[in-house]
Each structure stands twice: as C-alpha cells, then as structure tokens.
Amino acid sequence: QAIVSKARRPYIL
C-alpha cells in the first residue's frame, strides 16, 4: 500500500 505523506515523500507500509 503506497502512502504519500504531507512532505510528498512516497513510502510503502
């Protein structure tokens, strides 16, 4: 599941 933080940094949980 790809999530994008408020800093626009994509990371996978």
UniProtKB/Swiss-Prot annotation:
GO CC annotations, alphabetized: extracellular region
Keyword vocabulary terms for this entry: Pyrrolidone carboxylic acid, Secreted, Vasoactive
Disulfide cysteine pairs (residue numbers): none
Annotated compartments: Secreted
PTM sites of type Pyrrolidone carboxylic acid: 1
One Gene Ontology term from the biological process aspect of the record: blood vessel diameter maintenance
Function: Smooth muscle-contracting peptide. Peptide action is not affected by tetrodotoxin, but is slightly mediated through the release of acetylcholine.
Family statement: Belongs to the neurotensin family.
Protein known as: Neurotensin
Gene source species: Rhinella marina (Cane toad)
